[in-house]
Amino acid sequence: GSHSYRHANLGKMDQAAQQADQAAADALFQEVLGTTPALLRPPYGSMNKTLKTTSGRSIVTWSIDTEDWRSKDADKVVTGVENAGNLDGQVILLHSIYESTVAATEVLVPWLLEQGYQLVTVSELIQLRFGDEVEPNRTYNYDYFRFQVPPLPAETVPAAA
């Protein structure tokens, strides 16, 4: 997914500015990867109604904010995730631009796997955990990841009488 081109606050932009930023990001994705992303994680999690309804992207935020950008402390990031409770179906916000976050990730990935978690893309999470297809102009945010009840597996659904 995209995180925008200029890392500007998309929620404070009008539609023309949002589209210009998205077009610049799309051009770069197309040049480097040969495709454009279907997902957008807006910087700061900031969005407005215009972005939600006209971006043509699925907008994804997070359900656990490590605040790695604030502390820049690997140990605090690790402890925060380890103490966050049940992480099943959660999206953990991390910023790879900080060395401390990279160091925290080197600890967290093995720990998460040892705890039995499976690491998947956001699209896979939405489909596998919640049974939804990723839809353009839909927002997947804290409430979606924290409070959406996953569907029961087919074998546990009672048969109709």
Question: What do the predicted segments below correspond to?
Answer:
Residues 1-4, 38-42, 58-63, 90-94, ...:
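Structural recognition of the beta-strand scaffold that forms the well-ordered cores
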Residues 4-6, 14, 44, 96-98, ...:
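A mature extracytoplasmic/lumenal domain signature
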Residues 88-95, 101, 112:
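Periplasmic/luminal catalytic loop of GT-C fold multi-pass membrane glycosyltransferases
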Residues 31-37, 116-119:
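Surface-exposed helix-capping loop/turn segments at secondary-structure junctions
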Residues 100-161:
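C-terminal domain-boundary segment and adjacent tail
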Residues 8-35, 46-88, 101-104:
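Alpha-helical scaffold elements lining the catalytic groove of polysaccharide deacetylases
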Residues 10-11, 92-94, 150:
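A short, structure-level motif marking secondary-structure boundaries and short turns
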Residues 37, 42-43, 106, 110:
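Proline-centered helix-kink/hinge sites
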